Swiss-Prot record:
GO terms for molecular function: ion channel inhibitor activity; potassium channel regulator activity; toxin activity. The keyword Signal does not apply. Blocker of human voltage-gated potassium channel Kv1.1/KCNA1. Belongs to the short scorpion toxin superfamily. Potassium channel inhibitor family. Alpha-KTx 09 subfamily. Has the structural arrangement of an alpha-helix connected to a beta-sheet by disulfide bonds (CSalpha/beta). This is Potassium channel toxin alpha-KTx 9.4. It is found in: Secreted. Expressed by the venom gland. GO terms for cellular component: extracellular region. The keyword Nucleus does not apply. Disulfide bonds join C3-C19, C6-C24, C10-C26. Keywords: Disulfide bond, Ion channel impairing toxin, Neurotoxin, Potassium channel impairing toxin, Secreted, Toxin, Voltage-gated potassium channel impairing toxin.
Length: 32
């Protein structure tokens, strides 16, 4: 998932969205 979609992608999950190298990750201790 790209940076632009990251906040919506991670919404509703107990996660903090972060973006590295144009890749979205929802940090829950695991990489998404």
């Amino acid at each position: 998932v790209g940076c632009a979609e990251c906040p919506m992608h991670c919404k509703g999950k107990m996660a903090k969205p972060t973006c590295e190298n144009e890749v979205c990750k929802c940090n829950i201790g695991k990489k998404d």
